[in-house]
């Protein structure tokens, strides 16, 4: 790769343009002059001329946050901020007492004192120069020396100026400085910029109040936050998942917003139809069962009701006390089975007002209550064999009367007599009395004697 060394100072440059600009520092030539009538400054490169033209602009977009002083250029503001730095290192001149914030400014100031006394030697490299201006430019070159090898080097140099960049992309972005193409216009001050990031930075720092006022008028406040501070973002937090049907007793229903309370869940299309509410009479007897709750599952039957042997018992209620078949007075202590209404009971019965769940039996028994016609040809010993009855006694009370069956008398005749002698009413389950129950035939195998009616054990049927 061809290099261009300087014959005067020994510096080497990679491009011809950089070498030419460097030669201007030796020849004191300034080809780029300011066009302002009152300014006669000239510069060695186009870039430095354009940077100087910003000082003639009435718009000072760079403002100090400490003293509100404004500047045309950003580097001027940066140099000014060092005056407000409490940790700054001040370089004071021993001859005149003037202080500088940078080493370069301090050395240049010392070079002026040395040049006034006739000494044009560089204090850094001990190079002797011809004039004071050359000495100042030489001191500036020392400040622009290459950084240490540990840092990243700027290898990509601009073809139009002496600036170097880390990547070629930075070089292409820098080219707008040389082309002068400014396609980005500020909507507040009509200032134009060659790069979009420069316009964004200018808008945030200079017209932040105008942006806020415009956003308040249009109602678009969210876009203002993104424009002013891209790192600040508004994030909408979703509500935590919460069951809509939560009870108010847990103290969480009050914390839900009003929109959640107003939500209603529509049932699915294939959902089952809701259960019919219970009657008021059953709901009063069972307050724990809500009207909308499904009924509890029914218990399985102990016996197969489809069998022909037990088909007459299919319409009867489930298992009750077997001893009550022989003594009707035992049913006085049994609870009722959820009557739908007290008016549906048999007229011969009425609920006791003092004791809920008991039946007051009338003193007079209807004559047709136990007038049953039971054929004596059917054998119900398999059905009655599982009953455990007390041993035979000489006298057994059936209600308040005594029933005596002889060996030669038939059961229907004795049951008819029982209806005339019995003073206690028959058992009623719901609205069905004992005379209306479809009881199966009862065998007439009874032991002889003058005692009460004794139902036999299973082995008595084979005697």
Swiss-Prot record:
The keyword Repeat applies. Residues 268-306 are annotated as: Disordered. Coiled coil: none annotated. One of its GO terms (biological process) is regulation of cell cycle. One of its GO terms (cellular component) is nuclear body. A zinc finger (C2H2-type) spans 4-26, 32-56, 62-84, 91-113, 120-142, 156-178, 184-207. Pfam families: zf-C2H2. One of its GO terms (molecular function) is RNA polymerase II transcription regulatory region sequence-specific DNA binding. It is found in: Nucleus. Disulfide bonds: none annotated. Its main location: nucleus. Transmembrane segments: none annotated. Keywords: Activator, Diabetes mellitus, DNA-binding, Metal-binding, Nucleus, Repeat, Transcription, Transcription regulation, Zinc, Zinc-finger. The keyword Metal-binding applies. It is linked to Diabetes mellitus, transient neonatal, 1: An autosomal dominant form of diabetes mellitus defined by the onset of mild-to-severe hyperglycemia within the first month of life. In about half of the neonates, diabetes is transient and resolves at a median age of 3 months, whereas the rest have a permanent form of diabetes. Belongs to the krueppel C2H2-type zinc-finger protein family. Interacts with THRSP. Acts as a transcriptional activator. Involved in the transcriptional regulation of type 1 receptor for pituitary adenylate cyclase-activating polypeptide. This is Zinc finger protein PLAGL1. It comes from Homo sapiens. The gene is PLAGL1.
